[in-house]
Amino acid sequence: MNIAVFIKASLNLNLIKVDSSGIVNLEETALAISEYDKNALEEGIRIKEKFGGKVSVFSALTYGPVSKRQADYERIIRETLAIGADEAHIILDEKLVGASNFEVSLALANLVKKVGAFDIYITGEASMDTSSYQFASRLSSLINVPAITFVRKIEIQEKDVLLYRDLEDEIQIIKTSLPVIVSVTGEINQPRLPTLKQILQSKTKPIFKYSVTDLELPKFDLSKEIRILPVSRKNIFVEGKNLEEISEKLIKYLIDEGVLKI
């Protein structure tokens, strides 16, 4: 059983650094494995322990600068190997720092296709810092593998897999075949902690590093441009001899501004 687990190095919400102006200092805030991704990793390891195979971790560093973050990031990746993953494939490139959800998803999709085919792809339902809940669905469209989200239980059978989806007021059971992408909730398991022996053994497990140029991405802008659009009041005062005249003028202004259509 070939198992791919996607890990995000999120901002450590317990160690947020705030500057004197009250703005979160992203560069000084430490990284940590996103909580739901710990559940994804645990589930991948449990599947490997039951059916055999290999767990491969995939990740991209999205907080920079890369030169400053790399040691902390690789510590996190090494932690996933200590917990039980067999190898890790990571993207280290300044072009992905601050990239959009689509750009990061595309980079990881190309990376996983470059490495090989997998029977099951597991990710957390959302990251603990941005919580966009998008990755599983985006990955599905990019590698053409069906995705089932918000899964709280996985039962792999001889030819099929039963997935228990956690909806608001019910549990939905879906029967499907492999390969499949699964995003898991926090209720699916209790993540384990690595032993000292596992931590030492993790140093011998491989971490494969890639840049954006290694992934044959299409030409698109991986940079983020932030512009603050000027906002100013027009200070239009509506005056008239009576309410009827004022109402007519107000309606005309609203129509001219495109706010009102009659």
Over which residues does each language-model region extend?
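N-terminal beta-strand-loop-alpha-helix module at the start
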Residues: 1-60
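Short Gly/Thr/Asp-enriched flexible loops that form oxyanion-binding sites at enzyme active sites
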Residues: 130-143
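Conserved acidic residues
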Residues: 86, 119, 179
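A glycine-rich helix N-cap at a beta->alpha junction
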Residues: 71-100, 183
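Glycine-rich phosphate-binding loop signature in dinucleotide/nucleotide-binding domains
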Residues: 112-119
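Electrostatically charged, flexible surface regions
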Residues: 151-262
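Short beta-strand segments
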Residues: 4-8, 59, 91, 123-125, ...
